[in-house]
Amino acid sequence: MPKGGVARRATKIRAIRSETQNPVLLLDAGDTLFGQMLALQSEGRVIIEAMSAMGYDAMAVGQMDLAKGVDVLLARAKEARFPILSCNLVNAQEQKPIFQPYALLERGGVRFALLGVTEPAALEAPGVRDVAQVLDPVATVKKYLAELKGQSDVLIVLSHLGVEGDRALAQALPEIDLIVGGKSRRVMSAPDIVGSTVITQMGYDGEWLGRLDVTLDAQGQVRDPQSTVIELGPDVADDAELKALADSHKERFAQPTTEPAK
């Protein structure tokens, strides 16, 4: 039986939130919207609706999120109840970010800055090269770090650069506290530590949910990162609300049956 699904994911997310009094951030590093036929048929609406219902805080733009073009993803971003982030995917003519570059939020008295960064291969998505450019990730993130200085206690980068790109980013910009990565499809049972930057990544196709517990010391530094791999297998019960949402989209896009010849 296949793994994954938004209904199982929602069950685990609810459980995590119910068992802790600590702030919980729900984040996604991209390549999220078009991995399944239903997502393609709905132009990503089913995934955006599900993520909004689950209370996601932010996601980054990955190459596959642009599979239907920039305009479709912009439309989904307007519908989402969370920001879709990329600081370095810019309008080809004005050199301004196409999507929101970062988000600021506060949980439990802690100020978080969330910054999205997209891989150069995003230009290979249909029609993207005609309207957009991808700026150098390190230089662009560095520019925004200067802008965010003093506005946050914890700086998190949602990165679709891949593991090696994440490591290069951490080496160049040690002020980054945490990188939540995508693209490389790694299931990281333990975080990668580069200097003082914590790097994590959790698989592909929504088959796993990654949990990373961290402690903030008196100086606001991330300490003692503990990673948990949560497999969304058939033993995980479906959340009723998310199952109903997914089923409603399945019914809408179901192929009509062919009447037998008489």
Where are these regions (language model features)?
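Acidic, metal/ion-coordinating pockets
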Residues: M1-K262
